[in-house]
Amino acid sequence: MREFERALERGEDTLVATFVLGELRKIVRESDDTQPRSDDPARLLFRSIEPFLADGSTPLRPGQIRRTSLLPVWQWLLREGAPEQAGEFEAMLGRAGDGQPSPQVDAAVRKLQLAAADAIQKITGPTAGGDKQRALSRVGSPNVVEDLLPIAALLQARDALDTLNGRLPSYLRAFGESQIASASSALNVPSLQTPLLLPFALSLVMQRLSSPWQIIRLAVKMAASDDEIRVAATPYGVAVTVALHDLSCLAASLRADIRRGHFANVAENLKTLHDGVRGLRTELDLRSDSSWRKQLTSIRAEISNALQSEIDSVPGRVRRILRQKADKDILAGARIDAGDVDEVAALIDFVAVCRTYASELAINEVTLRTYSDLQQYVEQTTEALVQSLRGGDPRARPYRQAQVSAAVRFCEVLFGRDYASLMSRAAENALTGERKSSRAS
């Protein structure tokens, strides 16, 4: 079990390690049902931190904590950080039975949270005695140590964060002047205005925004200017850093989805990226040589490169399916894979979606050219394929019918359902005419 726990601490193979560790814990619990479940106290202790947890190996931004850091911190608290308080808490949960929320449990959780925060501050503070680095290494990996101070700050400020949560609307479709003023008022709490806690408070606001990039409007409001230098000089300048980080992560996720051929979320992610890039570019006065400008340019370039390479491949994929062959080159039993047709149709739709957001994402020229070429090629080829159904070798006709079906599918994406229905009827008429001609002869 300890090896899997170490793997979680290091962030290695977290999916497999979490699953196997969970199964091992079940076996341990079944072997001694009288012992309180070791993960219940930890879950209760860190429940208030859950909105800020980040999974996976993506780089962390201000306002986030690694989920994999919680287990080592809890084990350290049990072992040496606050063993008496943690032991009392486990015993209390054992007496309570189910550990369900109650005033008694909540009071015990709050007491342990404050004790945990105090223990973390002692080991990380400048007054920590002895070999500080060795003591910190006993808590966990460098990533865990990096998360210690934020964890302590969040545990200590739980009441202030709960109050902020209660004052914020559950969802903010718009983030205009009145909403910005309301959010600013809710955030105006001294304990939340520290450099360590403010990013977490801003994250709570972001989670309620329909367009999370709009969090930069709080920074612009506080600076009373859209000038980058003035915005960066305020504590709320971190909101821009957070927005840029999230856009960068979304761009990386989009690139990974495209490489895997997963297009289900591409339209939504492209819209989010388009709106975010445009929002930061238009609502902030960014200098050409600034760090924020370079980050934004890098995000646009990453999106552009990922999209352009995929867009360039689409016409070739379409031609491989619709290319007309001589009857002698069509083998008996030749077929077109339905999965290939579905994939190419999704790619054509992908190009159409890219066209909507092309100008802001620096892919305008390639997208418009590719889409125009696809329209011209599919229109001409579909008409030619329909005509080919009127004659030719009967043995090749099933393959040509499959080509026409694929072409009609592509027409629906490019020209709409009405045009696709028109070409489908034309294909049926061509086949009917050919059958009549064959009977007459």
Task: For every predicted segment, state its role.
Residues L280, Y377, T381, A407, ...:
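TPR/TPR-like alpha-solenoid repeats
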Residues A362-V366, L414-L422:
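Structural helix-adjacent loops and short alpha-helical linkers that scaffold large soluble proteins
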Residues R278, D285, E412-V413, Y419:
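Helix-capping and short linker residues that terminate individual alpha-solenoid repeat units
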Residues Q401-G416:
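TPR/TPR-like (Sel1-like) alpha-helical repeat modules
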Residues M1-L389, D393, R397-P398:
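Extended alpha-helical scaffold segments
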Residues T297, R417, S421-S438:
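Beta-rich interaction/scaffold domains
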Residues L270-L273, V404-A407, A427:
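Short amphipathic alpha-helical coiled-coil/interface segments
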